[in-house]
UniProtKB/Swiss-Prot annotation:
It comes from Variola virus (isolate Human/India/Ind3/1967). It is a multi-pass membrane protein. Belongs to the orthopoxvirus OPG096 family. Early protein involved in virion morphogenesis. Participates in the formation and elongation of crescent-shaped membrane precursors of immature virions in cytoplasmic factories. Induction: Expressed in the early phase of the viral replicative cycle. This is Protein OPG096. The keyword Transmembrane helix applies. InterPro entries: Prot_L2 (IPR008447). It is found in: Virion membrane; Host cytoplasm; Host endoplasmic reticulum membrane. The chain crosses the membrane at residues 39-59, 67-87. It comes from the Viruses.
Length: 87
């Protein structure tokens, strides 16, 4: 159990270091642009990071649960066919 706790502590420390690095890069990009464009650059970077995170979680979800997702898709298709052709 102690090994897992140590590993989690290492992950938290690495995430904090990564976040500081990303903030440093974003800060550098913001100050290269005119002041009027800084909020737009900040918004663009935040949207880009959000899309990357959503993509990573979607790939993980599909790769780990593709059988259940295929069964769910088959159920939806069969219910749709039942609704349109039988009723």
């Amino acid at each position: 159990m102690e090994v897992i706790a140590d590993r989690l502590d290492d992950i938290v420390k690495q995430n904090i270091a990564d976040e500081k690095f990303v903030d440093f890069v974003i800060h550098g990009l913001e100050h290269q642009c005119p002041a009027i464009l800084r909020p737009l650059i900040r918004l663009f970077i935040d949207i880009l990071l959000f899309v990357i995170v959503i993509y990573i979680f979607t790939v993980r979800l599909v790769s780990r649960n593709y059988q259940m997702l295929l069964a769910l898709l088959a159920l939806v298709i069969s219910l749709t066919i039942f609704y349109y052709f039988i009723l």
